[in-house]
């Protein structure tokens, strides 16, 4: 089977081909395509190349039996199947539809112009009339007497200060707690839990001995204002014990 390109029977191959595509024209010789032994050897890429070198209204004649795959390739490359192995390269033209005016008027719907949407919109940037023609709104009337701003709750009625206290009560209570702790240590007071000597892990939250090392049950812990019990070390401070007593410096 052979492929043949022509516009008509009298035209030569140069009238049907675009001479600029010299690299593709070399496939053609004496108005015939190189012989194809099998239809499967013709690929879509080959069909596209053939369509590219055809001029407008150029005709491709397929000699021999043709199967559906070959027709599909030529149609996919832009050629129109005229039957009997003839394919033509059509010219795509865009024309305006000539619709009578009467049929055009019968069309339903109305074109919505963009300009129409902005004609009835409110102009928020309109200049304010200051000549007294427009009423000026009193800003005091904008607030209603019935609407009241919620006041921040006070912690005066609570036993302890709030967690996010900003009035200074939290700092004052912390200072009082420290003073009370020192006073309890000076008076050798012992809490009722009875676990003060075991260490911080067994002491209650308000234990006056929190922060001090564990001591033996029955030992007296006194606060001496004149003695130094902490000695500065390289890594940490250590508590000095003398005669079973813990010395604190204030």
Swiss-Prot record:
Residues 104-149 are annotated as: Linker. It is found in: Cytoplasm; Mitochondrion intermembrane space. Coiled coil: none annotated. Residues 1-104 are annotated as: N-terminal SAM-like domain. Its cofactor is [2Fe-2S] cluster; [4Fe-4S] cluster. GO terms for molecular function: 2 iron, 2 sulfur cluster binding; 4 iron, 4 sulfur cluster binding; electron transfer activity; metal ion binding. [2Fe-2S] cluster binds at residues 155, 162, 165, 167. Keywords: 2Fe-2S, 4Fe-4S, Cytoplasm, Iron, Iron-sulfur, Metal-binding, Mitochondrion. GO terms for biological process: iron-sulfur cluster assembly. [4Fe-4S] cluster binds at residues 193, 196, 204, 207. GO terms for cellular component: cytoplasm; mitochondrial intermembrane space. Residues 193-207 are annotated as: Fe-S binding site B. It comes from the Eukaryota. PANTHER family: ANAMORSIN. The C-terminal domain binds 2 Fe-S clusters but is otherwise mostly in an intrinsically disordered conformation. Component of the cytosolic iron-sulfur (Fe-S) protein assembly (CIA) machinery. Required for the maturation of extramitochondrial Fe-S proteins. Part of an electron transfer chain functioning in an early step of cytosolic Fe-S biogenesis, facilitating the de novo assembly of a [4Fe-4S] cluster on the cytosolic Fe-S scaffold complex. Electrons are transferred from NADPH via a FAD- and FMN-containing diflavin oxidoreductase. Belongs to the anamorsin family. This is Anamorsin homolog 1. It comes from Paramecium tetraurelia.
């Amino acid at each position: 089977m052979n492929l043949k390109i022509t516009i008509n029977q009298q035209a030569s191959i140069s009238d049907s081909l675009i001479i600029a595509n010299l690299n593709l024209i070399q496939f053609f010789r004496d108005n015939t395509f190189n012989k194809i032994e099998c239809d499967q050897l013709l690929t879509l890429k080959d069909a596209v190349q053939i369509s590219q070198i055809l001029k407008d209204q150029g005709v491709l004649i397929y000699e021999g039996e043709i199967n559906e795959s070959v027709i599909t390739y030529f149609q996919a490359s832009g050629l129109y199947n005229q039957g009997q192995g003839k394919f033509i390269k059509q010219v795509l033209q865009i024309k305006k539809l000539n619709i009578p005016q009467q049929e055009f008027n019968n069309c339903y719907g109305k074109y919505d112009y963009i300009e129409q949407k902005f004609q009835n919109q409110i102009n928020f940037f309109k200049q304010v009339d200051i000549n007294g023609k427009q009423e000026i709104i009193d800003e005091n009337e904008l607030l209603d007497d019935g609407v009241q701003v919620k006041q921040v709750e006070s912690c005066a009625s609570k036993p302890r200060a709030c967690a996010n206290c900003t009035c200074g009560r939290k700092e004052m209570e912390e200072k009082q707690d420290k003073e009370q702790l020192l006073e309890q240590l000076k008076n050798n007071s012992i809490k009722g839990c009875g676990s003060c000597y075991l260490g911080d892990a067994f002491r209650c939250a308000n234990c006056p001995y929190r922060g001090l090392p564990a001591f033996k049950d029955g030992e007296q812990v006194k606060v001496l204002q004149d003695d130094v019990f902490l000695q500065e070390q390289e890594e940490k401070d250590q508590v000095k014990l003398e005669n079973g007593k813990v010395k604190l410096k204030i």
